[in-house]
Regions:
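Flexible, compositionally biased loop and terminal segments
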Residues: 1-227
Length: 227
């Protein structure tokens, strides 16, 4: 979800206007994803590094997040969309976190699509947190070091109940992972568009999925073995 600030700056508008337009793009993409049959959609809404932004901008973003979560509950309920959140959520303001937890609880039983908001999230931080949880289990005698493998590690990630992403879309021409789902994106197809996030439309999502479907995903195997 890159480009909110640049979108606003290019129009001579305050950055908060770009963030509000970005929230509208979220609504479009969530609706389009449901229509297209996407089962899991994860949005990088607020990174761990975003805490380094000016305090005033962080307050605006937290207010916008709270407004979005409260305002979208009817849509989530009507479309049977399950809401989740990943990240170091205890860093969020208490009122925002409370409303987020309520929305998550209200939609917990839905299965049409899972919408995950990555908030106060960093891929490196997630791996560190998973490692700490495993180390604590070893310390308590619940695990032996030789029992630790990839499958066990995955169980301690924030995304333990989610599939690995098939497609990673980067807007505004960015060509890096930016600390997003580092473990999970090992074999994700990366699609880069020059569109800034506030301009991202259903048609852009369709184009990204179409490009994904044209790719030959080998997962490290040769073409012959894959066939």
């Amino acid at each position: 979800m890159d480009g909110n600030g640049r979108w606003a700056t290019a129009r001579g508008l305050p950055r908060v206007v770009g963030h509000r337009s970005g929230a509208e793009a979220v609504r479009r993409v969530v609706e389009a994803s449901c229509e297209l049959g996407v089962k899991a959609l994860t949005l990088y809404a607020f990174s761990w590094e975003n805490w380094d932004r000016p305090a005033a901008e962080i307050r605006e973003l937290m207010g916008l997040l709270d407004e979005f979560v409260r305002g979208e509950i009817p849509t989530l309920l009507a479309n049977r969309i399950r809401l989740r959140a990943i990240g170091r959520l205890d860093q969020l303001p208490a009122d925002v976190l409370g409303n987020l937890h309520r929305a998550i609880a209200q939609t917990a039983s839905f299965e049409r699509m899972t919408l995950t908001l990555a908030l106060s999230y960093g891929g490196r931080q997630e791996i560190v947190d998973a490692t700490r949880r495993i180390a604590e289990r070893v310390r308590r005698g619940e695990l032996a070091p030789e029992q630790i493998d990839e499958a066990l590690f995955v169980q301690h990630l924030y995304t333990a109940d989610l599939p690995d992403p098939d497609l990673l879309i980067r807007t505004s021409g960015e060509q890096r992972l930016s600390n997003f789902l580092l473990w999970q994106s090992s074999y994700a197809e990366i699609y880069v568009t020059q569109k800034l996030w506030p301009d991202f439309s259903k048609e852009d999502l369709v184009d990204a999925i179409a490009e994904y479907e044209r790719r030959d995903r080998r997962f490290g195997r040769t073409a012959a073995a894959h066939a």
